[in-house]
A protein has these predicted regions:
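Extracytoplasmic gate region of multi-pass secondary transporters
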Residues: 61-103
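Helix-to-loop junctions at the C-terminal end of transmembrane segments
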Residues: 10, 112-125, 210
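C-terminal transmembrane helical hairpin of 12-TM major facilitator-type secondary transporters
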Residues: 126-172
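C-terminal membrane-cytosol helix-exit motif in multi-pass small-molecule transporters
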Residues: 23-43, 229-235
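Small-residue (Gly/Pro/Ala) motifs that create kinks and tight helix-helix packing interfaces
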Residues: 1-10, 84, 201-210
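Juxtamembrane intracellular "pre-TM" segments in multi-pass secondary transporters
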Residues: 37-68
């Protein structure tokens, strides 16, 4: 619903309409939180009998996974922000219609999360991670070089990228939680924070990249993803993950 509603508001009232709507929603949510008494859920305090390793910020596996999360969502939001410009300039598709084209992206992300639940019962996390990185890197490169070729090809590429994005959060969260069982709340908070930074930076950076340089922009991202894939494939990562 959000892409369709956003495109409708944008087509009629431009960015002022969109941000005014978001402001109203934010005020309503604030009032709900302020006036409605939400009971606190207290979790039992677990006494740890073993020393907890909290040096996660220097842990190579954690840094690798967080960097991967950053890159995935950096790329995804770069595509989301670039897509309206691409559709308008290359395919002559207006803002109102382009919002409808965002709906399959949302669906693909949901499908990705459902696929992960099924895959996780049959395959281990590292195997799923390798396949996901490979697919995302390959289709990121294809998006960079084929985004102006055909709207059908573009739609297929974006759909597959969205599916990979749907798999990533649950997959990385599972791996991180298993590695840092006793402090998973803290490390997942860091992971999500970095992920959101990736979204913001990706959305901002693509805005200053001229259209002729888009292919090289996404090629650079692909190279970084390949480097992470190669690191994950070596035994050192496997041993550290199994620690």
């Amino acid at each position: 619903m959000a892409p369709i509603l956003g495109s409708t508001l944008g087509a009629r009232w431009d960015y002022i309409g969109i941000f005014s709507f978001l402001l109203v929603i934010s005020i309503v949510l604030f009032l709900i939180i302020f006036f409605i008494d939400i009971p606190n859920v207290e979790k039992g305090i677990v006494k740890l009998t073993e020393k907890i390793e909290e040096k996660y910020l220097t842990d190579k596996v954690f840094i690798t996974l967080v960097t991967l999360g950053f890159l995935i969502f950096f790329t995804y939001f770069s595509i989301l922000v670039y897509l309206p410009t691409l559709l308008n300039n290359t395919y002559d598709i207006g803002v109102g219609i382009s919002g409808v084209l965002f709906l399959p992206i949302t669906v693909s992300v949901i499908l990705g999360s459902l696929f992960y639940k099924r895959f996780s019962k049959k395959y281990n996390e590292i195997m799923i991670l390798r396949v996901t990185i490979t697919g995302f890197a390959m289709f990121t490169l294809l998006f960079g070089w084929l985004n102006e070729s055909n709207v059908i090809i573009l739609s297929v590429i974006i759909f597959i990228l969205g599916t990979c994005v749907g798999i990533v959060p649950a997959l990385l969260a599972t791996i991180i939680s298993k590695r840092f069982e006793h402090i998973k709340g803290k490390v997942l908070g860091v992971f999500n924070f970095v992920r959101y930074i990736g979204m913001t930076v990706g959305a901002l950076l693509i805005g200053i990249i001229s259209q002729p340089l888009v292919a090289f922009y996404f090629t650079t991202i692909t190279i970084m993803l390949i480097i992470i894939f190669l690191y994950i494939k070596i035994g050192d990562f496997q041993l550290k993950y199994a620690k």
